Amino acid sequence: MIIGTRAVMYAPVEGPALFAILEDAAYQNMDGMMPYPQARGVMRLRAKSHGGVFVAMSNARTVQSQWENTGPGTVETPVSGYSTAIHPLASPLKDATPWVRWLNRDELARLADATIGARVPHTAVRALSKALESGPVLLSIPQDSTSEALSCAKCHRQARCAKCSGPLQLPADRSESAPRCQWCGAASIHWTCPGCGHERMRVVRVGAAGTAAELAGLFRGVPMVLSSKAQGLVRDVPCKPMIVIATPGFEPRVRPVSNERGAAGHEYRAVAILDAWTSLYALGVDARLDTLTAWMRAVSLCAPRSRGGQALILGETDPAIAQSLMMWDSRILASKDLDERMETGMLPTVAAACVWGRRDAVMTLMQRIGALGGDWAVCGELPGMLGPVPIAQPDTVDARELEATADRVKAVVRVPQSQRAELAIRLHRETARHVASREPGELRFRIDPKDLI
């Protein structure tokens, strides 16, 4: 048996082996070095060549997995194809998971909670205080961030591009008045919210800070532990009454103080998801999936309902995310995401590649592969190319020295899944020509990118 991180996808094996990957959509499974392989695709390819079995495991089902076992038009490629879905039975699943409640405005109004709008309403304070009588409580908070998102000034729905549904951002050049799409670069002139019809936007800064100081006033005298990238990782905490505040990926394990409590000594008595509203403004194609994955990972540390465990979602979020967590059925979100991607022509319903580098090099490549005025100018009824959009200069000094200009852009090319292999061949051929002919400027590409931004 070979167990490891991303690099283990290349480990030598013999015979019809089992190739299993955990959290196949995680950023850590995407190699950041040329040729940018994905662990999921590499392991599926190796399983096929070895006559073995490939298994993708995660708390939240990815859109790729949903498409492979339910999506119409699924195409068999070396790195994807038809698969069999595995989901736990309802009865044992209910016994193994906590009671999950969504305390949004409607639910708090139904409960006649007078603290509607508070970061931690009284209903949540009572539930968490009760849980603290018998053990630790985990509060999951968003990562601190300086990123900005645009939303409707009235209903707070995220502002998205009418052309490709990408997130809008303020232009880097403040002389421009119209926000631009981060995916296709189109200017959003005369924007109107599709939810309420409002015409104004507002800037939302996503992140959380000062949580421990704020909660100290709600839970007086209760010990608190903070685990985050900024504060440092806390690996485990004793199974005693305390509040543990952690960002996604930094949740400590519960360490039993004795063997008398059995499995209960390894569990949080309650888990609360704070600032759920930040999920409404998360960027990226897999933003909702990443949110659900992080929340499921945190809630999985909670005691099951048979031992009194409960989880609370505090604040507004996408109903599909909340329902998936409350039912512990990520197929709800995966199905919705897949339907939306079929409408907008996004992965995995199409094959796509990100191409970036100097503007003239990118545009020349797009023309040569047929994405500009050629046979790939359209993908179905949608444009075959998105962009180009300006991107930041490389962080490293060496990469900066390779740039003859600051005009660095990224574009996306989309083709039907049946032409995925041809897309890879054309991109490889044209980038090789660019290098061999010593044409100036950076030029790179990535097939099936995790994000389009």
Model-derived regions, located:
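Conserved interdomain linker/interface between the two RecA-like ATPase lobes of SF2 helicase motors
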Residues: 55, 59-153
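Loop/turn-to-beta-strand initiation segments
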Residues: 1, 15-18, 48-55, 136, ...
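Flexible beta-alpha connector loops of hexameric P-loop NTPases
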Residues: 26-37, 112-116, 200-204, 279-289
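Accessory helical-bundle/CTD segments and flexible terminal tails appended to RecA-like ATPase motors
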Residues: 82-112, 219, 231-288, 297-453
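Conserved helicase ATPase motor motifs in RecA-like P-loop NTPase domains
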Residues: 25-27, 32-73, 77-89, 143, ...
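SF2 helicase catalytic motif II
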Residues: 6-50, 54, 266-282
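Conserved RecA-like ASCE ATPase "motif II neighborhood" in helicase/translocase motors
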Residues: 2-18, 246-260
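Cys/His-rich short segments
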Residues: 119-220
